[in-house]
């Protein structure tokens, strides 16, 4: 019952601040940054750090990265258990490829869905907790990288290290169009197979093998 009441309070709070949330999303989306544009990434990262500070009051730690895809980390709450929230601030499309516009209550533009909408959701989750005086009872740690769209080569080790002591990890990708929450995702595994024997054609000369 207590959890249900808290959920209702949080939802009511977010509904009340919907216009501000959309403005924050618009601000972040209009600060475009494809993975390959390091200068643009720096600008959107600066905007992201500013939003986190203004909305949550929390300071960010910005990692150094050789190629400029610097991850941003901040945390909120206390507790023995940690929940890790993962997101990214880079986008696929080159600057200017997609235009920002609204259609009814829908927002369109580069990164609205993938995944600046998720970043804003994470930030406003913390703001709701703080403004409503609700203790999450856990440490909430957030890590947003800038090279996800090309495979997270520079940030994988950082994310894996932060995940080691996490009770759970949640990726801040928005839900599907009907509101369903994604609870699983396909992965990628690479194998190197070394075979010792006698080469032969499996279809035409398999008897020549071993």
Please name every model-derived segment.
Residues 106-121, 201:
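Glycine/serine-rich anion-binding loops at beta->alpha junctions
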Residues 202-210:
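Acidic-enriched catalytic cores of C-N bond-cleaving enzymes acting on peptides and small amides
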Residues 116, 120-186:
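Acidic/histidine-rich catalytic neighborhood of metal-dependent amide-processing enzymes
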Residues 1-5:
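N-terminal amphipathic/basic-hydrophobic helices that include classical n-h-c signal peptides
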Residues 66, 87-89, 145-147, 172-175, ...:
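Fold-independent oxyanion-binding glycine-rich loops
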Residues 84, 107, 167-171, 190-192:
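Short glycine-aspartate micro-motif
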Residues 32, 85-88, 122, 142, ...:
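Buried hydrophobic positions in well-ordered alpha/beta secondary-structure cores of metabolic enzymes
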Residues 7-112, 131, 136:
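Acidic/His- and Gly-rich active-site-bordering loop/insert found
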């Amino acid at each position: 019952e207590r959890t249900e009441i808290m959920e209702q309070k949080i939802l009511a709070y977010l509904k009340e601040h919907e216009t501000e949330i959309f403005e924050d999303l618009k601000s972040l989306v209009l600060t475009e940054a494809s993975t390959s544009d390091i200068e643009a990434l720096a600008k959107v990262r600066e905007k992201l750090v500013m939003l986190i500070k203004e909305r949550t009051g929390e300071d960010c730690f910005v990692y150094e990265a050789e190629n400029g895809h610097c991850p941003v980390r901040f945390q909120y709450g206390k507790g023995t258990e940690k929940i890790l929230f993962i997101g990214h601030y880079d986008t696929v499309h080159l600057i200017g490829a997609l235009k920002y516009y609204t259609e009814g209550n829908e927002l369109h533009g580069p990164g609205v869905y993938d995944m600046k909408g998720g970043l804003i959701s994470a930030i406003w989750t913390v703001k709701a907790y703080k403004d409503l005086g609700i203790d999450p009872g856990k440490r909430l740690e957030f890590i947003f990288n800038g090279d996800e769209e090309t495979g997270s080569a520079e940030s994988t080790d950082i994310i894996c290290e932060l995940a080691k002591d996490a009770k759970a990890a949640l990726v801040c990708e928005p839900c599907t169009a009907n509101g369903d929450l994604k609870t699983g995702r396909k992965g990628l595994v690479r194998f190197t197979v070394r075979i010792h024997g006698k080469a032969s054609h499996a279809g035409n000369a398999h008897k020549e093998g071993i």
